[in-house]
């Protein structure tokens, strides 16, 4: 088993499927557009709370957006 798992995501794909801009999604979950951009590019790992808010806003299950590598 790997010791250093990295949380990856398909946030951009899920966001585009919902026809949302980064700014639109950011407003739905109460963060900045820069935060959404940083999550999408893997520069920022969201908290559990933010990850769940993103899933709710995008009507997706956690495992549909986030995965470990």
Regions found by a protein language model. Name each.
Residues 1, 66-69:
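Short, charged recognition helix plus adjacent turn
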Residues 19-38:
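Short alpha-helical DNA-recognition segment
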Residues 41:
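Short, conserved catalytic or interaction motifs in soluble domains
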Residues 9, 19-20, 46-49:
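Residue-level signal for the short linker/turn that defines the boundary of a DNA-recognition helix
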Residues 1-17:
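A short, Lys/Arg-rich alpha-helix, primarily the initiator
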Residues 16, 27, 56:
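Alpha-helical residues within the helix-turn-helix
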Residues 49-64:
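DNA major-groove recognition helix of helix-turn-helix/homeodomain DNA-binding modules
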């Amino acid at each position: 088993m790997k010791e250093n798992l990295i949380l990856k995501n398909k946030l951009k794909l899920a966001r585009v499927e919902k026809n949302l801009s980064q700014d639109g999604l950011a407003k739905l979950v109460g963060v900045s557009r820069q935060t959404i951009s940083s999550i999408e590019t893997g520069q920022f790992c969201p908290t559990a709370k933010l990850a769940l808010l993103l899933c709710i806003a995008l009507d997706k299950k956690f495992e549909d957006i986030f995965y470990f590598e």
